[in-house]
Amino acid sequence: MTRMTRHLALWMLLSLAILASQSAMAQKLPDFTSLVEEAAPAVVNISTSRTVETRNMPFGQFGGQELPEIFKHFFGERFGDQMPMPPGAQGHSEERRSLGSGFIISEDGYIMTNAHVVEGADEILVSLNDGRELKAELVGADTKTDVAVLKVDADNLPTLTLGDSEDLKVGQWVAAIGSPFGLDHSVTSGIISAINRTLPRDVYVPFIQTDVAINPGNSGGPLFNLDGEVIGINSQIFTRSGGYMGLSFAIPIDVAMDVADQLRNDGSVSRGWLGVMIQPVSRELADSFGMDKPQGALIADLDPDGPAARDGLKAGDVVLEVDGQTVDSSSALPRLIGRVSPGNDVELKVLRNGEHRNVTVTVGDWPDSQKGAGGSAGDTAPARLGLAVRPLEEGQHDQAIDNGVRVVEVDPTGVAAKAGIRAGDILVSIGEHAVESPEQLSELIGELPEDRAVPVRLYRSGHSYYVALRLAQK
């Protein structure tokens, strides 16, 4: 065989290998065409409108005009709204519109989406795949899981098949259909990057992390597996630019349907509650407790009238398991307890003084269980802020303060947490009103305006602090 013949044969072998490799790769890539054709009719576009009071602020050198657009880009549309309105400031009504996605879960018109898509909306319109546009009623919304249920007046609507989010595996292919930037029925795909992901202030949801391209307008839309089953609701992204950066998060459909069923049947969502203040177990704390590695949730304080204190848990206990399920980190405990129906017993494995022991606790109901659309009894209680308080006991007063209530628990998804209030703080005053008791606090909260923030004075670690508190709209 000549040298040229050998080179020709080698070139042909390499070409065949490359073609075979490309063919094998093409066979492995999924085809989403059938999935999209079957699922698209049940995916909807959601548009909302709400009227807000804006204000022309005397903002420094801008002489009473609105905040310039360049600053709105960096600080957000509501930056000016967070500031108290000074004397002479003028306001006006303005209609704001937003877009999102959703999907039909029943033939008689129930639709699932994100709570943040419809939050504060005066009007909700749903655009169907067949071109119809229908007004929707908000059946209920749960801000802790970011799930909302809508209802349109229609029959014989197409629906989607729901999958099982418990069977998900990292690396499997998934696809999303939604309306990014209003471009309805856009399809994107990717893989599951991680499961059971906990995000700050979203402790009740074990998120599905994907690399599917999700952008504003995709929120509330379905995430599918290759069988065309809905396994999640696309909810949020991690971004530094305002757009997709490869980190997208979806609410598992099992979690979403549990919430949706409660909203449809009961008008509210019940969650288990222990009445404890917890903190992470650091490596140093783990060493001090004689643990092999950091894990579990350390109980730092208890509500003396709560289920945990009543049934024998103590400050300093490290909760390691809930009914046999490992508590990998402190953020896992609220999620595990939250899925237990109030009134049911759970067996907790705890570490106390270097010894493991089991403690049975009858789970209570979270003080601020979310109510359905329109609100219900309890909306004006301290729970409306997402916190629980108790009176100051003897010895808890300080020379610097002579009134207030102690914050014993803060819901990480509530308005109090967003304002910077922590468990252990003493809430001294709201606006110009001193807080004397939990009962009086309830009255003050019931009188708070929803159109502006109010100053709240806190006492923490020997110092006074002020935070701006804005109520979530009912």
UniProtKB/Swiss-Prot annotation:
The organism's superkingdom is given as Bacteria
Instruction: List the molecular function annotations (GO) for this entry.
Output: serine-type endopeptidase activity
- SMART domains assigned: PDZ (SM00228)
Q: Does the keyword Metal-binding apply?
A: no
Q: Where in the cell is it found?
A: Periplasm
Can you supply a Gene Ontology BP term from the record?
A: proteolysis
PROSITE patterns found in the cross-reference section: PDZ
Tell me which residues bind substrate. Answer: 217-219, 274-278
The set of disulfide-linked cysteines is none
Its EC top class is hydrolase
Q: Which residues form the PDZ domain?
A: 263-354, 360-462
* This protein's GO CC annotations: outer membrane-bounded periplasmic space
Pfam families, per database record: PDZ_2, Trypsin_2
Q: Which reaction does it catalyse?
A: Acts on substrates that are at least partially unfolded. The cleavage site P1 residue is normally between a pair of hydrophobic residues, such as Val-|-Val
Active-site annotation: 116 (charge relay system), 146 (charge relay system), 219 (charge relay system)
What Enzyme Commission number(s) does the record list for this chain? 3.4.21.107
Instruction: List the keywords (alphabetical).
Output: Hydrolase, Periplasm, Protease, Repeat, Serine protease, Signal, Stress response
- InterPro entries (alphabetical): PDZ, PDZ_sf, Pept_S1C_Do, Peptidase_S1_PA, Peptidase_S1C
Show which residues constitute the signal peptide.
Answer: 1-26
- The answer, when asked if Lipid biosynthesis is one of the entry's keywords, is no
Specify the protein name: Probable periplasmic serine endoprotease DegP-like
Source organism per UniProt: Halomonas elongata (strain ATCC 33173 / DSM 2581 / NBRC 15536 / NCIMB 2198 / 1H9)
The gene designation is: mucD
